Amino acid sequence: DGGLGTEETPVSLEQMAGHYKRSKYLAEQEVLKLAKQGLPVVIVNPSAPVGEGDVKPTPTGQMIVEFMKGRMPAYIETGMNIVDVDDVAAGHLLAMEKGRIGERYILGTKNLMLRDIFEILSRLTGVNMPSVKLPRELILPLAYLNLAFSWVTGIPPRIPLEGVKMAKYKMHYDCSKAIRELGIPQTPPEVALEKAVRWFHDHGYA
């Protein structure tokens, strides 16, 4: 509905794009069942972690790498909440120490539009940000074609299908509960992105 997601916002399995997100959702449902039976559970939900040590890299990290390589000719109008991975680690420990049993906490910082993120990356890297905004409806079939091409050639896909699917939802959150109750650090997204860019550069990703 365009509002901010909170710990109480209902979500469904159908909204989860890809096996990774679906598996996390299903695992959380099982944990919630155990919580109702008395298991002392505190749940944390990180937004979009970025920073050092992103070896695979994650979908968000791959987006940064593709930008650094100048392979981001266009963008989709969507939103994300970037959080420093070190703050996420701290948030897990703080949840263990201070979290209330049976509660969940969104670990995040500032809500940004994707264009804002690319503007920050452009300043950090000197790479021109994409100037063309494309509708998700156009990108989605291209992502499927790109995935099929990847299966045939073995070349990793350039258009992340799961990311395009998730772009349907503006991933903006109200993170005040974790700030208020846990005291999670709030490293600015600009700093988190700078750490990610430096790490990817130093380790030969871009």
Label each PLM-derived region with a short phrase.
Residues 22, 26-27, 59, 76-96, ...:
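Substrate-positioning beta->alpha
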Residues 3-8, 59-63, 148-151:
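Short, hinge-like loop/turn segments at secondary-structure boundaries
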Residues 1-3, 54-58, 119, 143-146:
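Short aromatic-enriched loop/helix-cap "lid" or pocket-rim segments at secondary-structure transitions
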Residues 43, 82, 111, 172:
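Short aromatic/basic micro-patch
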Residues 1-43, 48, 72:
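Catalytic helix-loop patch of NAD(P)-dependent Rossmann-fold dehydrogenases
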Residues 38-43, 47-81:
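NAD(P)-dependent short-chain dehydrogenase/reductase
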Residues 91-158, 175, 180, 190-206:
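Mid/C-terminal beta-alpha module of Rossmann-like enzyme folds, strongest
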